[in-house]
């Protein structure tokens, strides 16, 4: 539960045009979660305000997002259970840097690089790759909700992709992956595949099947480079920011320092029948 503290009012006043109305909307969401304990969502001001902002301050839309998000976390146990940063399989993928937040683009949206071929498909399961990626994404939402609320720009770097990587992504897993994008409160505004091999569209067509028309319209493929304008682009993408290795070290440390955060987050999943 939360209260209408002065800090909450200050937080709302800095981002929203009608603070009192927004506070009332957050209270509505809080009361709704209490009345629907099976959803078992995080009932803090910060969390509810984030869902409200990313729903364009539509309370009913925010309720649907909350319900979908916490149901996904309950159903996808392979991604959201036992998220100990010290697990060997998680450590390996953190070191490799499979999911690297970069910073805001020119439109102040959060840019992330997803390195689709950083892992060895003979050693690392795709579910563990997704698990590690979502651990970092969840922490990113906590550390920089302001930028994330404006949307996510994902650069999917396919450098080094091999047949083994494609074979890991069966249609069932692709469907679940796409569904998870839309279940998160922060929506992808751009999905740009770069360093893509010639046959990539055959692979991406399976993704497109499960995408909504809106998400499908935001997917682009490049042979090299990126169209994203971001001062912090990594060197590997032609920018002046930290390298993939430096970003991997940074986010590995952040995840390890926030181990308690994952224990707390584990409490919030819908109660499945």
Swiss-Prot record:
SMART domains xref list: SEC14
GO biological process, one term: phototransduction
Disruption phenotype: Visual response is impaired, characterized by abnormal electroretinogram (ERG) recordings which show loss of the prolonged depolarization afterpotential which normally occurs in response to blue light. Expression levels of the opsins Rh1 and Rh4 are severely decreased.
Domain CRAL-TRIO: 86-245
Listed Pfam families: CRAL_TRIO (PF00650)
SUPFAM superfamilies named among the record's database cross-references: CRAL/TRIO domain, CRAL/TRIO N-terminal domain
Tissues in which the UniProt entry reports expression: Strongly expressed in retina, where it may localize to pigment cells. Also detected in lamina, medulla, and optic lobes.
Annotated keywords: Retinol-binding, Sensory transduction, Vision, Vitamin A
GO terms for MF: phosphatidylinositol bisphosphate binding; retinal binding; retinoid binding; retinol binding
InterPro entries named in the record: CRAL-TRIO_dom, CRAL-TRIO_dom_sf, CRAL/TRIO_N_dom_sf
UniProt function note: Retinoid-binding protein which shows highest affinity for all-trans retinol. Can also bind all-trans forms of retinoic acid and retinal, but has lower affinity for cis form retinoids. Required in retinal pigment cells for rhodopsin biosynthesis.
Name of the protein described by the UniProt record: Retinol-binding protein pinta
Organism annotation: Drosophila melanogaster (Fruit fly)
């Amino acid at each position: 539960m939360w209260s209408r503290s002065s800090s909450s009012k200050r937080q709302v006043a800095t981002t929203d045009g009608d603070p009192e109305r927004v506070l009332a909307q957050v209270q509505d969401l809080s009361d709704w979660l209490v009345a629907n304990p099976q959803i078992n969502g995080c009932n803090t001001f910060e969390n509810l305000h984030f869902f409200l902002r990313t729903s364009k301050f539509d309370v009913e839309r925010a309720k649907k997002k909350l319900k979908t998000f916490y149901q996904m976390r309950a159903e996808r146990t392979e991604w959201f259970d036992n998220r100990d940063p010290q697990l060997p399989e998680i450590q390996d993928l953190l070191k490799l840097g499979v999911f690297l937040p970069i910073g805001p683009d020119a439109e102040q949206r959060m840019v992330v690089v997803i390195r689709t071929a950083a892992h060895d498909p003979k050693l690392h399961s795709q579910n563990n790759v997704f698990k590690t990626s979502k651990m970092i994404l969840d922490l990113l939402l906590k550390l920089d909700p302001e930028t994330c609320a404006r949307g996510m720009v994902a650069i999917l770097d396919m450098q080094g992709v091999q047949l083994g990587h494609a074979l890991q992504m069966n249609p069932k897993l692709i469907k679940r992956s796409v569904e998870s994008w839309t279940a998160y409160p922060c929506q992808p505004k751009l999905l740009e595949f770069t360093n893509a091999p010639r046959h990539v569209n055959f692979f991406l067509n399976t993704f497109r099947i499960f995408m909504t028309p809106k998400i499908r319209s935001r997917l682009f493929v490049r042979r090299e480079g990126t169209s994203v304008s971001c001062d912090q682009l990594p060197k590997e993408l032609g920018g002046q920011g930290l390298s993939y290795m430096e970003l991997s070290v940074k986010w590995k440390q952040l995840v390890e320092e926030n181990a308690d955060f994952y224990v707390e987050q584990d409490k919030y999943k819908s109660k499945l029948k």
